[in-house]
Amino acid sequence: MRDPFFYRWHSYIDDIFQEHKERLRPYTEAQLNFNGITVTGVQVAPERGPTNTFQTSWQQSDVDLSRGMDFVAPRGNVTARFTHLNHTPFTYSIQVNNSSGAQRMGMVRIFLAPKTDERGNEMLFRDQRLMMIEMDKFVVSMRPGQNTIRRRSTESTVTIPFERTFRSLEESRPDQTTDAQQQFNFCGCGWPHHM
C-alpha cells in the first residue's frame, strides 16, 4: 500500500512537468509525422460482445494483507475481500499502410482517454491529454504495403496479471539459475490487468 503522501508528491511533480511543457514551443508537423506510414484503421475486439466496446463488470477477489502489516502477536494470514472493476480481455487490430517501399520499425503506444466530460460534452484533445493513461507500448516491424498489427490486452507491457499483483514471495520460488527466477524477481510494477 502506498503512503498517501506519494499521491500528493506525484501530483506536485506532474504539475511542475506540465508547467515546463507549456513553456516549450509546440511540436512541428515534421516532428510528429512518420513519413510513409499511415494508420488506416483501429479496432478493439473483445473476446465476446460487440466490436469497439469494452465489456466491464464488478468482481470480488481475496488478497493476503499480512505481508504489508506488522502484528504484535502472530495471528497467521490476514485476508481481505474487495470489489474491483474487471473487463473481458480484448485484442487491438491496427491497420497500417507502409508506402515507403522498405521495411520500417515503429513504436506503437496505445492510450485510453475519456471522450466526453461529466455533462456528456465532447472533450477537446488538450483537455483529454492530461487524463490519458497508457494501455500498451510495443515495437512493430512493418513490411511495405498494408499491415495489420494485432495485440492482445493481456500482452501489455504496462500491466501485470492479478496473480503477480498480490503474490506470495515465499511460495513457489524457482531455482536461482532458471528463467523462471528472472520472471519471479520481476518488480511487479504496472497497472493490474483488471483495472
Curated annotation (Swiss-Prot):
Note one Pfam family from the annotation. Answer: Hemocyanin_C
Instruction: Tell me, in one coarse class, where this protein mainly resides.
Output: secreted
What does the record's cofactor remark say about binding?
Binds 2 copper ions per subunit.
Query: Which residues are recorded as binding Cu cation?
Result: H10
Any one Gene Ontology MF annotation carried by this entry is:
metal ion binding
Swiss-Prot/TrEMBL induction comment? By infection with O.dukei and O.ochengi.
Q: Which UniProt keywords apply?
A: Copper, Glycoprotein, Melanin biosynthesis, Metal-binding, Monooxygenase, Oxidoreductase, Secreted
Describe the function of this protein: This is a copper-containing oxidase that functions in the formation of pigments such as melanins and other polyphenolic compounds. Catalyzes the rate-limiting conversions of tyrosine to DOPA, DOPA to DOPA-quinone and possibly 5,6 dihydroxyindole to indole-5'6 quinone.
The protein's name in its UniProt record? Phenoloxidase subunit 1
